[in-house]
């Protein structure tokens, strides 16, 4: 396999999360060749100099800047973007909405045999990329992996690790419930909200396929391993945690990522998954959450009036806020040994000791890029998921290189859920 000028190229470096990803690469100083790609050399270089100052590194450590536009309207623009893609082994990108800025990039990565990762939280984009480019990626060996940030690594990998434990015990993982804890008042990022508003506000134009592309298996056929999603539609009482839990804006994205992982990795032919976000039980916080949800809904249907009150793409919290943030994803599962007729409860806890909507997401993406680099030429290609493409390697890297810990046991009590409206 011929060598290339770069191991990794980062797209989106002028955005808030892209800058954090660049900072992480500079701080870690991994022994790789990497570059950034942007539309404007001046803007990118100005941003890089500020990032270097924050990271405490000299200008000599700054990456080269390649120039290309992610939205190509001329043959010249397409040629420039393809030239950048062809120079690298792995592409990582924070530039969204990905349905707008990722389509051509994924296509070129699949065609050039270049592995790709993004921080998308867009199921429509994911489905479309499977339908359009999975066969090409399988042929060229490109690993195309959306959902490599806070959407959806913590949830997808929690389920994966439970399944791996079940397999080691000669059993089958049949059910997982996840319960998510954020600091009170945590909302979605500006980029995530813009993506959600873009997705919900646009005219749906689904491609016609014989079956849901999420169910496509590693050979391109319809998988027999399906997932029933039973996430609550309203707030419920979660007995184990003595708190209310309920739906949130990104839970369908997590569930669809898990659905695809099951189709590829064969957890169970009748797998059941649910997800709830644990909530502060105070009336004041519940009122605040209700108001925030109402504002997001208003911004979707009346963007001219309300969208300006929400965080905008590129906007982010203070450094202190990011460094004191956190996320905990509790997993409660069940594995079944059909030969022995035994059921065993499983318990997991994925903890991130920093904000995950920005800082943690940037670090997850970079570490994903490092795993994809290690797996280059060693794993079959395709449009896949973090669990299927990265496996335990990403959990290990996140624990070694970031403020993340992962715990897994067979002794956890399954959470007791009683449906009861909290408002």
Report residues per predicted region.
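Structural motif
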Residues: 7, 89-90, 115
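N-terminal Rossmann NAD(P)H-binding glycine-rich loop of SDR-like oxidoreductase domains
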Residues: 8-27
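C-terminal catalytic/substrate-binding lobe primarily of soluble NAD(P)-dependent oxidoreductases
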Residues: 18, 141, 164-423
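Conserved glycine-rich Rossmann-like NAD(P)H-binding loop of the short-chain dehydrogenase/reductase
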Residues: 30-43
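Short, conserved SAM-binding/catalytic segment
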Residues: 47-58
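Conserved Rossmann-fold cofactor-binding substructure of NAD(P)-dependent oxidoreductases
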Residues: 66-88, 94-97
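ADP-ribose/adenylate-binding Rossmann-like module
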Residues: 97, 108-126
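Rossmann-fold NAD(P)-binding glycine/threonine-rich loop
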Residues: 120-142
